[in-house]
Amino acid sequence: MRSIRSFANDDRHVMVKHSTIYPSPEELEAVQNMVSTVECALKHVSDWLDETSKGTKAEGETEVKKEEAVDTYSKDQGGRTLCGVMRIGLVAKGLLIKDDMDLELVLMCKDKPTETLLNTVKDNLPIQIQKLTEEKYQVEQCVDEASIIIRNTKEPTLTLKVILTSPLIRDELEKKDGEKVAMKDPPDLLDRQKCLNALASLRHAKWFQARANGLKSCVIVLRILRDLCNRVPTWAPLKGWPLELICEKSIGTCNRPLGAGEALRRVMECLASGILLPGGPGLHDPCERDPTDALSYMTIQQKEDITHSAQHALRLSAFGQIYKVLEMDPLPSSKPFQKYSWSVTDKEGAGSSALKRPFEDGLGDDKDPNKKMKRNLRKILDSKAIDLMNALMRLNQIRPGLQYKLLSQSGPVHAPVFTMSVDVDGTTYEASGPSKKTAKLHVAVKVLQAMGYPTGFDADIECMSSDEKSDNEGKNETVSSNSSNNTGNSTTETSSTLEVRTQGPILTASGKNPVMELNEKRRGLKYELISETGGSHDKRFVMEVEVDGQKFRGAGPNKKVAKASAALAALEKLFSGPNAANNKKKKIIPQAKGVVNTAVSAAVQAVRGRGRGTLTRGAFVGATAAPGYIAPGYGTPYGYSTAAPAYGLPKRMVLLPVMKFPTYPVPHYSFF
C-alpha cells in the first residue's frame, strides 16, 4: 500500500494540471453572460408567441360557433407554446475546460417541435437579443440537428446550441391501459432521435447534479480525464456520459472523502480491472427505464485499448511518475533532502556499483545520542521558532470578545482566498489569507501594529501581567512569590485563592508540577469545582482542595490551571518555610528484638518493592541497610524513600553480622 506522502505528491501534480486546464475568469464571465442573455431572450420569444397565438385565436372566434369557440379556447389554455429552457451538458455539470467549451440549452416545447416552429424562434430570437444587450450574436438554424446555433463575435469565441424537444416524443410509444397511443405527427416534424437525445441529456444533467456534484474531487477528476480524452485518441470514445458514470461509481463507493490524486488513481484502477472488456459487468445507465448498457456503442477493440492504457497509467502512478500521465513537467519535492558531495573517482570507479554515504559523515558527535539531542535542543532554543503566544492570542488578551467576520471567499477550489475583518474602537481592519485561521491571524497583526504593540517574538507586551512575563522568561520564583502573596491575603477563611493567568505551565520552585508534588506528600486528595464564570472567550474556573483540614482555592482559564494553582497554594502554605519540617511524613521502621529478628526485618525490607518480592537462591542473607535507613531504588516503596539521602547509603550506618539460616526448598510457583 502506498504511503500518504506519495498521494500528497499526486495531489500536487493533479491540482497544478487542473489549474492549467481550468477556464480563466474572463472566459467564465463570457460564458455566463452569453447563456443568461440567450435564456432571457428565449423567455421573451415565448411571450411573443403566446401573444401572437391569442391574437389569431380572437380573430377566428367571430367565424365559429359559440360551442366550438369555447372548446378551442379551453384546449389552448393548457400551456404555453414554449414551456421552458434548461441547461444541459458541460454548462449544467460545471465541466468546462479550456479549448472544450460546448454550451448547450434545451428548449422544451408543448407540442412536438417542427421546422415551422424552429424558423419562427430563429427569426425572432435576434430581435429579442438586441433588446437585452449591445453585443452582436450570429443566429443560425440547423434542421438536421433540431437546433439553433448562436455564436458571439468577440473573443473568446463561444458557440451555444439550443435544441428543441418535447416530452410527447418519448411518451407517444408508451402503453396506456394496454394499448398504444396513436398520435398524428405533423409533416415537418424535426428529427425524432435528436429530440430523444436532448431529453436524455436533460436527465443526465439532473442525475449528475444530484449524485456527482457532492462528491469530493469528482468534478476535478472529470476535468482531468476530459483533457486526457482530448489529448489521447485512445480515450476519445469514453468521453461524455460513460466517463461521468465511471467516475461517480469509482469515487462514490469509497467510504471516505478522497483527494484529487487518490481519486484519479481509483478511477484508473477501476478501468484497469477490465470492467469494459467483454464478459465484464458493463456500465448500467441509471437514467433509462429499461436495462441499458452505456458502453454499447463502443467496439471491443476500443474497450481493450482503453483498458491497456489505464493499466499503463496505473503503473506510472505507482512508481511516482504521474506527471507522465498528465503530460506535464515533474514538480520539485516539497521536502528537500540532504545531498552528499560525491567525488569523481566514486562515480566513475569500477568497484563502486552502489552509491553509499561517505564514511566521514558517520563520524564525530552524531553517534552520541545525548550530544545530538542537546545540540538539536540548543538549535531550537536559539532559533526562537516557537512563540508561546501569537498575535491573535495577544489581541484576544488585550481586547477580549472581538468578533471576526468573513467578508468574502474568492479564488479557485484548490487555492481559496478568505478575507476576514474585525471592528476595534469603530475602526474596521481587513486581511486575507489561504484559510480563515490565517486571515484572522493577519487581521490581529494589523490591529496590534495599529495600536502600537510589537508583534515579534522578542517584543514584550505592556498589558501582560507579571505572571505571564515570568513564565515566558522561565522565572518560576516570581510565580511562587505571587502565589504566596495571594495565599496570605485570604486570612478571613481557612481557604486560600491563587489567581494565575499564564500561557506556560505552572511549576513549583523545584520545577515540578504542583499537583504531582502535592500528591507525593498527601495522597488521595480530591479537587472540586467551586465556580465557573465568564463567556466562551474568557472563562474563569475556581478549584478547591482540602489538605490537613485546610481548604485552598486556585483560579485559572481552565480546570487544569485552576487545579495547579490550588495545589501550588497548598504547597506554599503547608510545605514551605517553618511548616515544611512539621508536615513531612517520616517512614518509621519498627525495631525488632534480637539480632536474628533485626536481620530478618532488614532482609524483608531489602526484597520488598514494586510488585511481589522474590527470594534469593543462596543460603545467606546479607544485611544491606540498617534499621531506619532504606537505600533508594526499587527496594523501597514507590522506588524512592523520603527518609533516605539523595545518593547511596549514609556514611554512618549500623552494620549487622551475617547470620546463617537453614535452607529450605523454594517452589517455582506462588499462589499469592
UniProtKB/Swiss-Prot annotation:
Keyword Ribonucleoprotein recorded: no
Keyword Lyase: no
Record-level GO BP terms: cell differentiation; spermatogenesis
Occurrences of domain DZF (ranges): 5-363
Compartments, as annotated in UniProt: Cytoplasm
The organism's place on the tree of life at top rank: Eukaryota
Compositionally biased tracts (Basic and acidic residues): 357-371, 466-476
Span list, region Disordered: 349-371, 465-498
Residues annotated with Asymmetric dimethylarginine modification: R612, R617
Pfam families: dsrm (PF00035), DZF_C (PF20965), DZF_N (PF07528)
Keywords: Cytoplasm, Developmental protein, Differentiation, DNA-binding, Methylation, Repeat, RNA-binding, Spermatogenesis
MF term (GO), any: double-stranded RNA binding
UniProt domain DRBM: residue ranges: 387-453, 510-576
InterPro entries given in the database record: dsRBD_dom (IPR014720), DZF_dom (IPR006561), DZF_dom_C (IPR049402), DZF_dom_N (IPR049401), NT_sf (IPR043519), STRBP_DSRM_1 (IPR044472)
TM regions (residue ranges): none
One CC-aspect GO term: cytoplasm
Complexes and interactors: Interacts with EIF2AK2. Associates with microtubules; it is unsure whether such interaction is direct or indirect.
Function: Involved in spermatogenesis and sperm function. Plays a role in regulation of cell growth. Binds to double-stranded DNA and RNA. Binds most efficiently to poly(I:C) RNA than to poly(dI:dC) DNA. Binds also to single-stranded poly(G) RNA. Binds non-specifically to the mRNA PRM1 3'-UTR and adenovirus VA RNA.
Name of this protein: Spermatid perinuclear RNA-binding protein
Source species taxonomy: Eukaryota, Metazoa, Chordata, Craniata, Vertebrata
Protein encoded by which gene: STRBP
